C-alpha cells in the first residue's frame, strides 16, 4: 500500500515486536520513493538548506542508527548538519559545499551516507567493499553543506527584494565581471570559506589581493583574518574535537584529486590518493600554487600530518548542471569507500 517492505519497517523501528504491539504504539512507515527498489533520488533538483533538512529527516526515519548532530551555525543561524554512519573507533570526515555554487557536492555525500546505511541494514556492498564491515570498523562523519547561506543564495531561496539578497548583490557590485548569483562561492558575508583557514593564510591573502580580491564579494576574498567566519570556525573546532584519520573536502570542478600541502607528505597519503584516482578515473595532482593555501585540506594536513584530500568533481562551469550528478556520484562512491577502508585498517 505504501510502497514499502516489512524489512524497511523493521529497520525504521528498532525493537519493534510486530506480534506484540501495545495500543497507541507509533510506527514509522518509510513510504517508498524506492521506485522498483531503486535508491532515493538525490540529484535531480537544486538544493537549499531546507531541502537538505528534509532529506536528513528522511534518512533518520529510515535508518535510526544514523546519528544526526550539528557542528555549528552559519552567519544566518542555519545549522551545519552532520551525519555519522558507523560504530568503530577510527573516524574520517567528508565535507561538501564550502563553496556555494559547488552545491552539487551536497547530494553526492548525502547519497553516499544513505547508501552506506541502506547496504548495512539490508546487506550488500558499496564501492566494492562489504558495507557491514565498513560500518563495524569505524565512523564516517558527513558535513554535507558547510555554506548553507551561500547555497541558498545561488539556488534562489532568497527573494530578490529581501534584505539578504540585496546585501549580497551590493557586495557583488565590487566585482561586476562575476555573474550574480551564479558566480557566488563565498559565505553570505562575502568571505571565501576555503581561503579562511590558518594554513598559509597570509600567503593566500597576498596572492588574492594581487589578483584584485581585496573586498568581500562572490569569491576569493580571504576574510579579515584566518577563521573569521562562523562556518570555518565551526569546521575547525569540530575537527579539533575529533581524531580524524583522513578527510575529504568536496568541490567542483575538474575531475581531479589534490593530495598535498607544501612539503607535508603524510604517511600513505599518496598511495591512498593513487587508489582513489585509479578507482574513479580522476587525476591525482598537486594543488596549483595560486590556490595552494588556506583551504580546509591544507589546514588539516598541516595540523595533523594525516591524509587530506580536495576532490574536484565534474567538468564545466560552476554551478554544474544536475545532469552530471549520476556520473559524479559513480566516480566518488569508490573514493569515499577507499578513504574509509584505508583509514579503518
Model regions and ranges:
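Alpha-helical scaffolding within the catalytic cores
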Residues: 77-80, 126-129, 291-298
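Metallocarboxypeptidase
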Residues: 182, 197-345
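Short glycine- and acidic-rich boundary segments immediately preceding or forming the N-terminal edge
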Residues: 8, 31-76
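Extracellular LysM carbohydrate-binding repeats and other cell-envelope/extracellular binding modules
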Residues: 5-37
Amino acid at each position: 500500500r505504501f510502497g514499502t517492505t516489512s524489512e524497511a519497517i523493521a529497520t525504521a523501528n528498532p525493537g519493534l515486536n510486530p506480534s506484540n504491539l501495545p495500543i497507541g504504539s507509533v510506527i514509522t512507515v518509510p513510504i517508498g520513493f524506492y521506485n522498483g527498489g531503486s535508491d532515493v533520488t538525490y540529484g535531480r533538483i537544486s538544493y537549499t538548506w531546507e531541502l537538505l533538512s528534509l532529506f536528513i529527516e528522511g534518512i533518520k526515519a529510515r535508518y535510526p542508527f544514523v546519528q544526526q548532530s550539528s557542528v555549528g551555525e552559519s552567519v544566518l543561524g542555519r545549522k551545519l548538519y552532520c551525519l555519522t554512519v558507523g560504530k568503530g573507533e577510527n573516524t574520517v570526515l567528508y565535507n561538501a559545499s564550502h563553496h556555494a555554487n559547488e552545491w552539487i557536492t551536497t547530494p553526492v555525500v548525502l547519497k553516499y551516507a544513505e547508501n552506506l546505511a541502506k547496504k548495512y541494514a539490508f546487506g550488500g556492498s558499496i564501492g566494492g567493499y562489504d558495507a557491514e564491515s565498513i560500518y563495524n570498523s569505524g565512523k564516517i562523519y558527513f558535513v554535507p553543506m558547510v555554506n548553507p547561506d551561500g547555497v541558498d543564495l545561488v539556488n534562489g531561496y532568497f527573494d530578490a527584494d529581501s534584505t539578504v539578497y540585496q546585501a549580497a548583490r551590493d557586495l557583488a557590485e565590487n566585482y561586476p565581471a562575476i555573474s550574480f548569483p551564479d558566480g557566488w562561492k563565498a559565505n553570505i558575508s562575502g568571505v571565501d570559506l576555503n581561503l579562511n583557514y590558518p594554513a598559509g593564510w597570509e600567503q593566500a591573502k597576498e596572492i588574492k589581493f594581487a589578483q584584485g580580491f581585496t573586498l568581500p564579494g562572490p569569491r576569493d576574498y580571504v576574510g579579515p583574518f584566518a577563521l573569521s567566519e562562523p562556518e570555518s570556525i565551526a569546521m575547525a573546532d569540530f575537527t579539533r574535537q575529533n581524531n580524524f584519520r583522513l578527510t575529504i573536502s568536496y568541490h567542483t570542478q575538474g575531475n581531479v584529486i589534490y593530495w598535498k600541502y607544501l612539503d607535508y607528505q603524510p604517511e600513505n597519503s599518496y598511495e591512498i590518493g593513487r587508489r582513489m584516482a585509479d578507482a574513479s578515473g580522476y587525476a591525482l595532482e598537486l594543488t596549483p600554487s595560486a590556490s595552494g593555501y588556506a583551504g580546509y585540506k591544507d589546514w588539516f594536513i598541516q595540523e595533523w600530518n594525516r591524509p587530506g584530500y580536495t576532490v574536484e568533481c565534474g567538468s564545466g562551469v560552476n554551478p554544474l548542471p544536475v545532469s552530471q550528478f549520476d556520473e559524479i556520484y559513480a566516480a566518488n562512491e569508490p573514493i569515499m569507500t577507499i578513504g574509509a577502508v584505508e583509514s579503518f585498517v
